[in-house]
Amino acid sequence: MSTLKRWTLKEARALFDMPFLDLVFQAQQVHRQHFDPSQIQVSTLLSIKTGACPEDCKYCAQSARYKTGLEKERLMEVQQVIESAKKAKAAGSTRFCMGAAWRNPHERDMPYLEQMVKEVKALGMETCMTLGKLDDSQASRLAQAGLDFYNHNLDTSPEFYGSIITTRTYQDRLDTLDKVRNAGIKVCSGGILGLGEEVKDRAAMLVQLANLPQPPESVPINMLAKIKGTPLADNEDVDPFDFIRTIAVARIMMPRSYVRLSAGREQMSEQTQAFCFMAGANSIFYGCKLLTTTNPTEDKDHQLFRKLGLNPERLSVSMGDQQQEDVLLQAVAEKDTEQFYNAAL
């Protein structure tokens, strides 16, 4: 069995310093060794609990500390989540990610979260959640419910992190990733560009991710969505070439991971997105809203896919659509009615 490469910051910086076209070419070569370059994984992200988060992440509209005009909402009812998942599947998504604006899940919410996972899986979709910090018991319960992926981003480098967040340490994030991995759940973890970081911070963040005991199976790279009312609302835009470079370096350093274009895609031109796919991005979030920010519409995505000759990746499942529907209906029929309909309470 081959051992995973341990990356140094010097090596990562050297990749960032490569001539742009050479870097993209190398990234595309690496990409083709592990993935079909014509396939794009399509994921949908739903905010199942919005706003009133106690954390102070300076980029986030969901923080209760900033006046962004975002209306807080309680945890969605399970039935609402399943209806959204059905629509996402019909639109072509194979993975459904559920995000909640919490520091960590409350124990009273765990049964509803577990049920969401079970019923989305009954649709034949991959499941992902992002709920903040987890303890060992919570990670184990989500794993037993069948959760495929857990998202918990590192955001930036350890050195720059304290300039962006003070209510949760970098080690807290690494500890949550360890708990997720130990529970048998796949890891989704990436970062954000445009926070005011330097190239060395982008390199250091990717080194942290690549050098985890096992690199994340999924690496979302976000471009800061500047939200009025947050401390970073007036930050400078990220140069598209710098964003593409980061995608390419992520692909080279984590060759077997899905590299996802996440927040900020609404602001990207088709040409920038195309270069990102050339640089090794092979996953997108799909749909009208990405938590609390806009995202390109499905029609625009389909048009771009056609222009580039790309196809949405299909998820292999063991059950046919009718079997999946039968499983879902049976799961609903067996549910405690009060829990199913009053998950928001």
From Swiss-Prot:
Keyword presence, Signal: no
InterPro entries named among the record's database cross-references: Aldolase_TIM, BATS_dom, Biotin_synth/BioAB, Biotin_synthase, Elp3/MiaA/NifB-like_rSAM, rSAM
Names of the cofactor(s): [4Fe-4S] cluster; [2Fe-2S] cluster
Residues annotated for [2Fe-2S] cluster binding in this entry: C97, C128, C188, R260
Domain Radical SAM core: 38-256
Pathway assigned to this chain's UniProt record: Cofactor biosynthesis; biotin biosynthesis; biotin from 7,8-diaminononanoate: step 2/2
EC nos: 2.8.1.6
EC top class, as a word: transferase
Disulfide bridges in this chain: none
Cofactor descriptive note: Binds 1 [4Fe-4S] cluster. The cluster is coordinated with 3 cysteines and an exchangeable S-adenosyl-L-methionine.
The keyword S-adenosyl-L-methionine belongs to this UniProt entry's keyword annotation: yes
SMART domains: BATS, Elp3
Keywords (A to Z) from UniProt: 2Fe-2S, 4Fe-4S, Biotin biosynthesis, Iron, Iron-sulfur, Metal-binding, S-adenosyl-L-methionine, Transferase
Recorded catalytic activity of this chain's protein: (4R,5S)-dethiobiotin + (sulfur carrier)-SH + 2 reduced [2Fe-2S]-[ferredoxin] + 2 S-adenosyl-L-methionine = (sulfur carrier)-H + biotin + 2 5'-deoxyadenosine + 2 L-methionine + 2 oxidized [2Fe-2S]-[ferredoxin]
Protein origin, superkingdom: Bacteria
Binding positions ([4Fe-4S] cluster): C53, C57, C60
MF annotations from Gene Ontology: 2 iron, 2 sulfur cluster binding; 4 iron, 4 sulfur cluster binding; biotin synthase activity; iron ion binding
Similarity field: Belongs to the radical SAM superfamily. Biotin synthase family.
Self-association and partners: Homodimer.
Described purpose of this protein according to its UniProt entry: Catalyzes the conversion of dethiobiotin (DTB) to biotin by the insertion of a sulfur atom into dethiobiotin via a radical-based mechanism.
Name of the protein in question: Biotin synthase
Native organism: Proteus mirabilis (strain HI4320)
Gene: bioB
